[in-house]
């Protein structure tokens, strides 16, 4: 089965956290509540689960499948699954399970060995080809930060973007020189490719070049990010700057932390403060943040009028 390649992600695509019960099980009721709240905002185009914000690699295969199936049933926007398996055959099997569970597309993570060692020329292209041809899952090209060896050079991005089955890119290169150089070329060579920023901590800087956002930040400030997207598309810098500045204390409290992985914990604390989650339980290797950090997040949300 091959799915629709015409998904419209031109707007906000939040990456929901995965709520857990206090004893550590996936809390599908809480996830449905979160997903329904997010999908209820006009301008939310999809929900992207099982990635970093969603602790997707911390879930068993059975939990991943159940999470896709239950969220798909709960919301009326497409559910997109993170595909994180290390080997290509493993990723294809993961993609097949995602399709069977109801996912409409896949956010394709690089093979994580590449983070340290880099990749052989042609290997990323083969990963995307196999996932689409063998699982029928439409693919989002995921550009990792420039600081890793798993980020793709421009030629690799262009080749993947031109492959059948690839309809969008989530770009998190976090190098503005490369962003300013590569995004215009991707746009010129692939005019139908939907370009989404995932620079949670650099949204203003990337807002004027994109079709939308695919961000964990969307968990906690969906209305504000939809407003930011509209300002970016209108090339209204003053309006975009106003949203950015209003959210800046939240951005700092959630994402300007010692490790970007702490952002997931901070997102859950923010959702707790907003009354969307009852608690902020995470799975190892994530650990709880301090009471002082939680208070910092609460005060930041208050300053942005989010609570």
Give the ranges of each region predicted by the language model.
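Active-site beta->alpha loop and helix N-cap motifs at the rims of alpha/beta catalytic domains
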Residues: 2-151, 287
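C-terminal alpha-helical cap/extension of soluble enzyme domains
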Residues: 8, 13-17, 37-43, 209, ...
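Catalytic alpha/beta core domains of metabolic enzymes, predominantly
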Residues: 145-251, 255, 259
């Amino acid at each position: 089965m091959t799915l629709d390649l015409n998904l419209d992600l031109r707007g906000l695509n939040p990456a929901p956290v995965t709520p857990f019960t206090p004893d550590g099980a996936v809390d599908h009721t809480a996830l449905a509540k979160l997903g329904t709240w997010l999908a209820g905002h006009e301008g939310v185009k999809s929900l992207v689960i099982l990635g970093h914000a969603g602790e997707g690699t911390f879930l068993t295969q059975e939990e991943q499948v159940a999470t896709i199936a239950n969220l798909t049933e709960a919301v009326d926007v497409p559910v997109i699954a993170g595909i994180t398996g290390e080997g290509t055959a493993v990723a294809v099997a993961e993609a097949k399970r995602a399709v069977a569970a109801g996912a409409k597309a896949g956010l394709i993570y690089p093979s994580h060995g590449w983070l340290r060692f880099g990749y052989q020329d042609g290997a990323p292209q083969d990963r995307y080809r196999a996932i689409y041809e063998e699982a029928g899952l439409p693919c989002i090209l995921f550009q990792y930060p420039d600081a890793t060896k798993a980020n793709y050079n421009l030629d690799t991005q262009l080749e993947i973007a031109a492959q059948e089955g690839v309809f969008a890119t989530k770009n998190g290169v976090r190098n503005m020189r490369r962003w300013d150089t590569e995004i215009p070329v991707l746009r010129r060579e692939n005019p139908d490719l939907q370009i989404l920023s995932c620079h949670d901590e650099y949204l203003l800087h990337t807002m004027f070049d994109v079709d939308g956002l695919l961000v964990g930040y969307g968990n906690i400030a969906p209305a504000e990010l939809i407003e930011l997207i509209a300002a970016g598309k209108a090339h209204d810098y003053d309006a975009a700057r106003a949203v950015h500045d209003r959210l800046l204390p939240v951005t700092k409290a959630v994402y300007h932390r010692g490790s970007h992985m702490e952002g997931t914990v901070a997102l859950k604390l923010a959702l707790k403060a907003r009354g969307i989650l009852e608690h902020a339980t995470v799975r190892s290797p994530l650990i709880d943040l301090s009471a002082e950090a939680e208070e910092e997040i609460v005060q930041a949300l208050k300053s942005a009028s989010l609570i």
